[in-house]
Amino acid sequence: VSPSYPAPYNDPSQWGIVPAWGFASIEESNIPELTPGTLLHGFWPTSSAPTDLKLQASEPSGNWVEISEHRQQLMGFYNRYTVIKTSLPVSAILDAQHVSSSYQDELDRLGWLAHFQAIWRAGYFLARYVFPSQKEQKPIYPLGDVAGVPWTKEDADLSSAVVVSLSAAGKTARSFAYSFERRSKETAPLGFLQVTSAVEGLSQATQSAAPPFPSKTIGYGDLSDEELVQWIKDLGPSKFVILDFGARDGALKRLLEIIKVKASLEASKIVIIQIGSQQKVLIIGSPLIL
């Protein structure tokens, strides 16, 4: 929050602004390549107030990195800003409801970009760099190098693993699956299990992708099914990589019980990566509404 905001909302230790992926137009700049009117895509506070950025040129051309000290503990993903070339005047973007119909296609393109670009990148980075799809690729810790935590080739190795996607129909999970199901045989897992409330749609998507490894899609209610237990046993994994994209309450616990008790794989190494959380709305004075 800005110190110029009225009290008490100018206290950054108590207040903040919810961020979101989207676009902003440059109003003032001391970087010659970024002139006023340039459109940037990135992570912004959901506010009409001006935002100050300290940007440094990056690769490829048109990409910029926020290097302010207070943002250095963020994943690099959140500090990257991209110049977006568009034929639309800024006024049309700010007042899309009254824009000429001739600009509608371009507005639609920007809308899709705002909604899906960050989600698509998140899933791609996870499939491509955290668990590299090429053996010679150096793996990167899930929170990025900024975390300072080692992530070795052994950590990223999936050759003896079953990979599990919880809340597999979520947007980030779908992005991950799209890239993951198209990796080569040499970096393939033993199997890929998707747990979702949209079994039919995901099953069709996986069938179309034709991944080079066994894949199974089940509903939350099928987690304790004997057929699933046998499927896991037949694969003979010594490692489970569980990607929790925001599963229903209790899903992760039930899965761990199946692995350790029903499938008799208590000696297996288990890696859990929490990527999302179940959305909940809490109304003060009322029960929790899901």
Give the predicted meaning of each segment:
Residues 42, 243-245, 274:
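Redox-cofactor binding/interface segments in oxidoreductases and associated redox assembly factors
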Residues 185-252:
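Adenosine-nucleotide cofactor-binding segment
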Residues 47, 167-174, 198-199, 247-250:
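Gly/Ser/Thr-rich loops at beta-strand to alpha-helix junctions
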Residues 2-57:
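Glycine-rich beta-strand-centered segment in the early N-terminal region that forms part
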Residues 43-160:
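NAD(P)H dinucleotide-binding glycine-rich loop of Rossmann-like/cofactor-binding domains
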Residues 253-290:
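Glycine-rich phosphate-binding loop and adjacent beta-alpha segment
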Residues 134-162, 166, 174-196, 206-212:
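Conserved adenosyl
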